[in-house]
From Swiss-Prot:
The gene is MON1. Its main location: membrane. Residues 9-21 have a biased composition (Polar residues). GO terms for biological process: autophagy; protein targeting to vacuole; vesicle-mediated transport. Pfam families: Fuz_longin_1, Fuz_longin_2, Fuz_longin_3. This is Vacuolar fusion protein MON1. Keywords: Autophagy, Endosome, Membrane, Protein transport, Transport, Vacuole. It comes from Phaeosphaeria nodorum (strain SN15 / ATCC MYA-4574 / FGSC 10173) (Glume blotch fungus). It is found in: Endosome, Multivesicular body membrane; Prevacuolar compartment membrane; Vacuole membrane. The keyword Transport applies.
């Protein structure tokens, strides 16, 4: 066969050449692995273009990017869970900008493609406690380009995705009605299929009850298909929980005579979708109660539930749209509270207690969808799901808004008691003139940003006038002691920015949840996430972080995610959860320090210490050999030359001052060192209740060690790498 003529393809080094007389040019010589320079510690370092193919011969802490392999190697973990795998929409890659398609969060070490087994592996988060080395040229160039970034990083936090942007912007548009002759059927079906998310509610007999998009004529065929699949599994004494079709995820939840289905192209896990379906089910129970629902279907299996639910479509649609836009409250199953000084909140709480009426069950003050204060009976707490329903009714749906300043609403709170009704008195305050009754509220679903509502809930049906009198006394007292003015200032101030909470922080946004209080807080979305699309993208990232941390059987406590445009951290302990996002140029050390400062501002001092003790096993990747002579150690420490230590500062010093001085040493550099064996022994003896989760596996002669499988980063300023 005659040799091929013409230009040859570009080689791996990017150098193109022309063939000479039909003979391909010779390939460059293969470089020796031992002579290759090591890659810098960050994938964002600036390098000169190589003149020949270069291989990486040293392990690196950076993961390979799935969207563009720098070395032409594609590695995927086909066993990635459904909850974390990427989904696409109409060809658009909808990923949360993770460093890999694989679930690398469960591993300790990561390597660049083609370098497995070469060199010693590094911790996936190791450089948080290390020091990144940059050449003088890199530092000079980065400083010269610094003025070009600034707040412009807000536009590059997430890469553009025109198809997803267009689909999301049309997500909340109503689907056209199908004409009588069916001439526009194809166009209507395209509109329906283009929606990113659907919620369907149907009876066990297959009768449609609710659909977020489309009328009965449009969804009847789909309802029939879904019911057939569910019935097939039920006939085999099995339960259908979910399935995937192409890039669409279906999640099914059966609740007595009802089947609820979530259909989504958004990156959400099954557990997150089930939480949303549970909220829709609770919304139905808040109208009917569980005994009424069961009685209706016991009498007739094909009962049409749309008649008793008539008028509640607005509430269901408001919930569904909130889930599609992204709801931090639903994701964390927690409530957001209005930021107030402790003295102001104490005054409001005392005022509620002093003015409460005899038949009051729950009393709440809510401002702009955030909880200000609540009074309740002992041993009777309000379920977060119940409060979500109330807030959705007041601040999202339009049903209560049409009633003006006060309303008397019978409703069922399923989390409190799903068998009966309570009665809620709702009064909206005019902050400019609190004693005057508000005559008319905004008719839009958005409402006013500074709305304040007083909610008084009673089990007595005839207590309307009693609760109204309590409301008048409450408002008068709040105005007299200055609480109205404090709430007005807090509402108008809004959420603080990240830099207001942590000055100089590179964070763009974060979510912090207090597990014990079932509350969360977050900074303002502005100026980096101002529109609904940017907020949805941010929630996509939070969804993935939340899924990676909480999906069983993993036991992750710290999860780090790196992408081409952002870097994120998820941190979960028995006391709190933290999710933080920063631009990709942010170092892991800066991200960890900012996360630690947030914890310091949110946790009380005692909880900070407990968190430190309880997460000793989440320490850094490597610890230096002990600088002290062997004779200075306990007998158990002498059995291994390379004894591991931790280096701590003020927290450990304070702990030592409290009575553990005998367990500390000073290194030749005057840095505090504490042997892990001694810490483990002391914690087992003196802090056993606090440190049950921190107990380390026993080595020879009972010496406590940290095995490689347990190495995780603990991003706290009081723990540093030696």
């Amino acid at each position: 066969m005659a040799p091929l003529r013409g230009p040859t393809r570009a080689s791996t080094s990017g150098i193109s050449s022309q063939s000479r007389e039909g003979t391909p040019p010779p390939l460059p010589p293969r470089p020796q692995l031992g002579n290759l320079p090591s890659r810098p510690s960050t994938s964002y370092s600036i390098r000169k273009a190589p003149s020949r193919p270069q291989l990486v011969s040293k392990a690196t802490t950076q993961l390979s990017l799935s969207t563009g392999q720098a070395f032409g190697t594609e590695s995927r973990d086909d066993a990635a869970s459904i909850a974390t795998k990427q989904r696409s929409f109409l060809g658009a890659n909808l990923h949360s900008h993770s460093t890999s398609d694989a679930d690398d969060s469960a591993s300790i070490r990561s390597y660049m493609p083609g370098t497995e087994g070469v060199g010693e592996g590094e911790s996936i988060l190791g450089e948080v406690l290390g020091h990144e080395q940059k050449t003088d040229t890199e530092k000079t160039l980065l400083r010269s380009l610094g003025h070009k970034f600034g707040d412009g990083e807000a536009q590059s936090m997430f890469p553009p995705d025109p198809q997803f942007d267009a689909a999301f912007n049309r997500e909340f548009d109503e689907v056209d009605e199908m004409s009588v002759d069916g001439s526009n059927e194809e166009a209507v079906m395209r509109q329906w299929r283009a929606k990113l998310k659907h919620f369907l509610i149907l009876s066990s007999a297959g009768k449609p009850i609710y659909s977020r998009h489309g009328d009965d004529q449009l969804i009847t065929n789909y309802i029939g298909v879904v019911q057939t699949i569910i019935s097939f599994y039920q006939s085999t004494n099995d339960v259908l929980r979910g399935f995937t079709a192409g890039d669409v995820r279906f999640v099914v939840m059966s609740k007595g005579p009802l089947n609820l289905v979530a259909i989504t192209r958004l990156p959400e896990s099954d557990s997150q979708l089930r939480t949303q379906l549970e909220a829709l089910y609770m919304q139905i129970l808040s109208t009917l109660t569980l005994p009424s629902l069961e009685r209706m279907f016991a009498a007739r299996a094909n009962y049409d539930l749309r008649r008793p639910l008539q008028g509640t479509d607005t509430l269901l649609s408001a919930l569904a749209d909130g889930f599609t836009r992204g709801s931090s409250s639903t994701l964390l199953s927690a409530l957001e509270c209005l930021k107030l000084r402790k003295s102001h909140r104490t005054t409001i709480n005392n005022t509620l207690l002093k003015t409460r009426s005899e038949n009051l069950l729950y009393g709440l003050i809510v401002a702009s969808g955030k909880l200000v204060s609540v009074v309740r009976p002992k041993k009777h707490s309000l379920h977060p799901g119940d409060l979500h329903l109330i807030f959705n009714m007041l601040f999202e749906a339009g049903s209560v808004k049409a009633g003006g300043g006060e309303n008397w609403i019978p409703l069922c709170l399923p989390g409190f008691n799903n068998t009966g009704y309570l009665y809620m008195y709702v009064s909206f305050l005019n902050l400019e003139h609190p004693t005057e009754q508000m005559q008319e509220r905004p008719s839009t679903s958005e409402g006013a940003p500074d709305e304040v509502a007083i909610l008084l809930i009673s089990a007595e049906k005839e207590s309307f006038f009693e609760l109204r009198s309590m409301r008048d006394d409450l408002v008068e007292t709040l105005q007299r002691n200055g609480s109205i003015e404090a709430m007005r200032a807090a509402v108008r101030q809004g959420r603080p920015k990240c830099t207001d909470i942590v000055p100089g922080s590179p964070l763009r946004h974060f979510l912090y949840k207090s597990r014990g209080n079932v509350q969360f807080t977050m900074p303002s979305f502005e100026p980096y996430f101002e529109n609904a699309l940017d907020k949805r993208r941010l929630l996509n990232l939070y969804n993935k972080l939340h899924s990676n941390v909480h999906n069983k059987p993993t036991t992750l406590k710290v999860h780090h995610e790196t992408g081409t445009s952002c870097i994120a951290l998820a941190w979960s302990t028995p006391l709190f959860e933290l999710y933080a996002v920063a631009p990709a140029a942010t170092s892991r050390a800066a991200l960890a320090q900012s996360a630690n400062k947030i914890i310091q501002t949110k946790l009380p001092s005692r909880e900070k210490m407990n968190s430190f003790y309880g997460t000793l096993r989440l320490l850094s990747r490597e610890f230096a050999p002990c600088p002290l002579p062997r004779s200075s150690h306990t007998e158990s420490c002498k059995w291994q030359l390379n004894v591991r230590h931790i280096h701590a500062n003020q927290y450990l010093s304070n702990w030592n001052a409290a009575g553990a001085q005998t367990f500390s040493h000073q290194s030749p550099t005057q840095s505090p060192w504490v042997c892990i064996d001694w810490i483990g022994r002391y914690l087992d003896e003196a802090r056993s209740k606090v440190t049950q989760s921190a107990t380390m596996p026993s080595g020879p002669l009972g010496r406590r060690v940290i095995s490689p499988d347990e190495v995780r980063l603990y991003p706290h300023s009081c723990v540093q790498e030696a």
